[in-house]
UniProtKB/Swiss-Prot annotation:
Stated role: One of the primary rRNA binding proteins, this protein initially binds near the 5'-end of the 23S rRNA. It is important during the early stages of 50S assembly. It makes multiple contacts with different domains of the 23S rRNA in the assembled 50S subunit and ribosome. Forms part of the polypeptide exit tunnel.
Keywords on record: Ribonucleoprotein, Ribosomal protein, RNA-binding, rRNA-binding
GO CC terms of this entry: ribonucleoprotein complex; ribosome
Recorded family membership: Belongs to the universal ribosomal protein uL4 family.
Protein's organism: Deinococcus deserti (strain DSM 17065 / CIP 109153 / LMG 22923 / VCD115)
UniProt-recorded name of the protein: Large ribosomal subunit protein uL4
InterPro entries linked: Ribosomal_uL4, Ribosomal_uL4-like, Ribosomal_uL4_dom_sf
GN (gene name): rplD
PANTHER family per the UniProt record, alphabetical: 50S RIBOSOMAL PROTEIN L4 (PTHR10746), LARGE RIBOSOMAL SUBUNIT PROTEIN UL4M (PTHR10746:SF6)
Amino acid sequence: MAQINVIGKNGGRTIDLELPEVNAAILHDVVTWQLASRRRGTASTKTRAQVSKSGKKMYSQKGTGNARHGDRGVPTFVGGGVAFGPKPRSYGYTLPRKVRQLGLAMALADRQDGGKLIAVDGFDLDGKTKSFVSWAAQNGLDGSERVLIVTDDAQTRQSARNVAWATVLPVAGLNAYDILRHDRLVIDAVALEPAQEEVEQ
């Protein structure tokens, strides 16, 4: 059981969150699955049937003294088709739901163990970039680290969206990959409840 400190304008409190021990292999599986799902898979090459070449045999089979060849579209010639080249496809695959949930919980645990998790009881920002920068400075965020902010508050998202070192995600978009690729995690306390439910299922 992890105790997470929550900061707020009316003082602090703690939240008890059941987090597992970090397992690098499971985190690797989840991150690899996420990255595979994000791949566009648009790489495409033309086969010998698709290149703009005549299908006519270059010269007769015998009598020229040259090597025997068919048409000019074969992969052995410059400008010919590609043998076994890539075609558009999906690189995504299925990962068990419990493994995905465990990966998210372990990513949260990793940030909590390293003292890189900040939970907030309402940001109380006015939508201005200046107000976010001021709030961040008061809470030890000076721009030297990349910060992931998870909240559904529209004013907070507007305040932070123009800050180069901050990334804002909605609560529903919380995922292991984005947590791990940022140095710090700043999360709205209300987002920890659905995260706990996700872990416990």
